[in-house]
Amino acid sequence: RDVAPSRGLGDVYKRQKFDCVIRDSYRMAGTGEERWHPSFCYHGFQYVEVVGFPGELTSDQIICCRLAVANEKHGTFETSNQTLNRICEITDRSISSNMYWSFTDCPQIEKLGWIETSHLMFASVADVYDIRAWMKKIIHDICDSQLDNEQASLAGNNEEGFVPGIIPAFYRIGGLYKDPNWNGACVFTPWAYYQYYGDEAVLRQAFPVIE
């Protein structure tokens, strides 16, 4: 089924967008209380469906661990309008759910390091979270991903100096491969960092890539 805005709360959507079946399997010993969690991956979701549980399952029997980088929260927003407050809360959850090794664009699909979010969402994130160290790391990764002459030759093209739209760039995705909103992050993100924090060192680090 397609995702429908009118879908009822609690309705689990199981369709695989890319026809990739992802499954965590755990065989219980059956000798007492057991706990398990994935060790090499994480999953984004809104609802969890449990099938085959013997007896009555209560919410306190399932623990959901929320994962994100440790960016300290220093900004808040609150009004007398509960709708605006709710929108702010939903937005904040969307932001924090994508703060990992890179700034991903969704926590439930491919979890790639799309770099356009690093500048398009910079102010929205920096107003609420201290992202100085985290964003420095992302800028370093963006600069480090630029193709040098040897890498361009190995790729069979003449794209020396090209900055991929995702980091690490292990494959290309259609028309986004050469879009300034994505590839231009090597310019826009360091500039946004400098404008917000006044750190010239970030500009000096990124300048050889920009040039």
Could you say what each language-model-derived stretch is?
Residues 82-86, 90, 120, 137, ...:
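Extracytoplasmic/secreted proteins, especially bacterial periplasmic and envelope-associated proteins
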Residues 118-144, 206-211:
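Carboxylate/His-rich catalytic cores and anion/metal-binding grooves
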Residues 1, 11-108, 116-117, 131-136, ...:
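Extracellular/oxidizing-compartment recognition motifs
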Residues 143-147, 195:
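HEAT/HEAT-like alpha-solenoid repeats
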Residues 53, 120-131, 186-202:
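Well-ordered alpha-helical scaffold segments within catalytic/enzyme domains
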Residues 109-117, 130, 177-188, 205-208:
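Aromatic- and histidine-enriched alpha-helix N-cap/loop-to-helix transition segments
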Residues 2-3, 191:
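Alpha-helical hydrophobic/aromatic positions enriched in membrane-embedded helices and signal peptides
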Residues 4-10, 195, 199-200, 208-211:
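Short, intrinsically disordered, charge-balanced linker/junction segments flanking boundaries
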